[in-house]
Design a protein with these regions (language model features):
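Hydrophobic alpha-helical
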Residues: 117, 129-148, 232-293
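Hinge/beta->alpha junction and helix N-cap segments in small-molecule ligand-binding domains
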Residues: 73-82, 104-114, 171-177, 199-217, ...
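N-terminal helix-turn-helix DNA-binding module of bacterial transcription factors
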Residues: 1-59
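Flexible loop/hinge segments that line or gate small-molecule binding clefts
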Residues: 138-176, 291-303
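Short helix-capping segments at alpha-helix termini
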Residues: 94-98, 150, 222-229, 276-283
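Amphipathic helical "hinge" segments at domain boundaries
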Residues: 53-113, 117
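Residue-level detector of conserved catalytic or cofactor/ligand-binding positions
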Residues: 308-318
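A conserved helix-loop-strand patch within extracytoplasmic ligand-binding domains
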Residues: 179-196
Length: 318
């Protein structure tokens, strides 16, 4: 066998199999019009060379356009999902040669009807793929069942739902993250017997599946290693931030000896900025995500630790 170039080309395979380039192309792409004898020779050569098609070149040669839709929770500029959106748009710009485009639909994470309406709009468009941020499992399954019925691939970002498996998931293991956060909390708390969990709640609903799983992991660690530590809870309003300071004032009047707390959402800055405004420098606070206001609180000392993925780059992975 003559020496082959480092990068195997279709014409090299055609020469070795003694067939035309067109025949090799038809075999590689599973098209008809090839005799069994020629097909067998080509497949043997492909196997010997461990040939892998150049998907990038194939995509460039194709005129097909791909439309993806991403379903995200509604959010304000500068919040956690802003960075995720940035990553999505960067990915589309990076791989623009593949004729891809993306549309982002939004839903209210506290309103099932909002999610239902947004998902129905996506199904009507029948895109080539869907990215879902599944903040609530009870909202998601009906949607993904319909995607599967239409043979539309979907991936999860940020939060995973094991009972409804996607093509891929990009995010952290939320329960392990909460378990680790509890360990960090108790390194700060040492022998303290009380800690507090701060939540953002709307009509009894936590904003995301991810937050719930973080808390499950947190409580698991506490049960295993610090069962005598009392875990207090303060539920702040998800949509009425003007009342947060009053609720925090009332909490600390009721529990003046509590010196350690954690929040499992991305808005630790709400508590951090409150601590600054009240001059409370003896409170250890752990939060999530590198939002600008969180980082400012971290630098100024009102947040002790932030746990975060480098999430801006997550959606840009090929």
């Amino acid at each position: 066998m003559n020496k082959l170039p480092e990068r195997i080309r279709i014409k090299d395979i055609a020469r070795l199999a003694d067939v035309s380039v067109g025949t090799v192309d038809r075999v590689i792409h599973g098209r008809s019009g090839v005799s069994e004898a020629s097909k067998k020779r080509v497949e043997e050569i492909l196997k010997q060379l461990d040939y892998q098609p150049n998907m990038y070149a194939s995509a460039l040669a194709s005129n097909k356009k791909y439309t993806f839709i991403c379903l995200l929770p509604e959010h304000l500029e500068g919040e956690y999902w802003t960075a995720v959106e940035t990553g999505i748009h960067e990915a589309i710009a990076t791989y623009s040669d593949f004729n891809t485009s993306v549309k982002i639909n939004y839903y209210d994470p506290y309103d099932y009807h909002s999610f239902e309406n947004a998902s129905e709009a996506i199904l009507a468009l029948q895109p080539d793929g869907v990215m879902v941020a599944p903040t609530a499992p009870q909202y998601t399954k009906g949607f993904t069942d319909q995607l599967q019925a239409l043979d539309i691939p979907y991936i999860y970002i940020d939060s995973n739902i094991k009972d409804v498996p996607p093509l891929a998931f990009f995010g952290q293991n939320s329960r392990q993250s909460g378990y680790f956060a509890a360990r960090m909390m108790m390194l700060l708390a040492r022998d303290e017997k009380e800690i507090v969990i701060f939540r953002k709640i709307h009509e009894g609903i936590v904003g995301s599946n991810q937050q719930e799983n973080r808390e499950i992991g947190f409580r698991q660690y506490m049960k295993e290693h610090h069962p005598s530590c009392t875990i207090l809870e303060l539920d702040l309003h998800a949509e009425r931030n003007d009342e947060d300071n009053e609720m925090l004032d009332e909490f600390f009047r009721t529990y003046p000896t509590v010196k350690n707390g954690i929040t499992f959402n991305s808005k630790a800055y709400i508590v951090g900025e409150y601590l600054q405004s009240r001059g409370k420098k003896d409170f250890n606070l752990i939060g999530y995500d590198l939002l600008e206001r969180n980082v400012t609180c971290l630098k100024e000392g009102s947040i002790s630790f932030l746990l975060s993925l480098i999430h801006i780059s997550e959606p840009t992975r090929p």
